[in-house]
Amino acid sequence: MVIQRKYRASRRLGVSLWGRSKDPFNTRNYPPGQHGNMGYKKPSDFGKQFGAHKKFKFYYAISSKQMRNMFLKAYKKKGDTGDNFVGLLESMLSSVLYNSGLVPTIFSARQLISHKHVLVNGKVVNISSYSVKPGDTIKLREKAVNLPSVLAAIDAQEQKVPDYLEVDVKERSVKYLRVPKYYEVPYPANMEVNLVIEFYSR
């Protein structure tokens, strides 16, 4: 199953990245390919930085190139680089949709977007990395509101909706209120943005 293969990232990194009950890490908290729980090797400083980079990359389901471009953009902006970086990541259309709890995974969010099932202020947007602005309203199109994955996500309520989003479950919509700071994002895992900054600053 595609989602299960993607969840292998949790086992590779030694954390439950998305905090989901179906995450294989919950029952097999050791690296994939390893027979039995022999634990994880203690990483070097570079290993810690690289691991932090990987956690963000997999959590948001983006490429290394996208990650680097976002970091460079965050670095050039005024203010705290870590907050800027996370703010850009959380402003992606796929992130807002996933954090709304209207979809079960970041992967399903990206799929709905690419299949043109998502509206931003009434217009179809099919780019997952589209930057949502404060005040924008994201809504599922009519043909997607009762998809099994959407109904299952709403029923499960596994996603903690952050304060910077306003969700209307009945309307299958979410309003992006503001760009969050790093500390405001309810990551299920320990996401060390300082190590990502160190990784890109080498």
Swiss-Prot record:
Membrane-spanning segments: none
Keyword flag Iron-sulfur: no
Keyword list, A-Z: Ribonucleoprotein, Ribosomal protein, RNA-binding, rRNA-binding
Stretches assigned to the S4 RNA-binding domain: 91-154
A molecular function GO annotation: structural constituent of ribosome
PROSITE patterns in UniProt: S4
GO BP annotations listed: ribosomal small subunit biogenesis; translation
Pfam families the UniProt entry points to: Ribosomal_S4, S4
GO cellular component, one term: small ribosomal subunit
Keyword match rRNA-binding: yes
Functional note: One of the primary rRNA binding proteins, it binds directly to 16S rRNA where it nucleates assembly of the body of the 30S subunit. With S5 and S12 plays an important role in translational accuracy.
Subunit and interaction comment: Part of the 30S ribosomal subunit. Contacts protein S5. The interaction surface between S4 and S5 is involved in control of translational fidelity.
Family to which the UniProt record says this protein belongs: Belongs to the universal ribosomal protein uS4 family.
Name of the featured protein: Small ribosomal subunit protein uS4
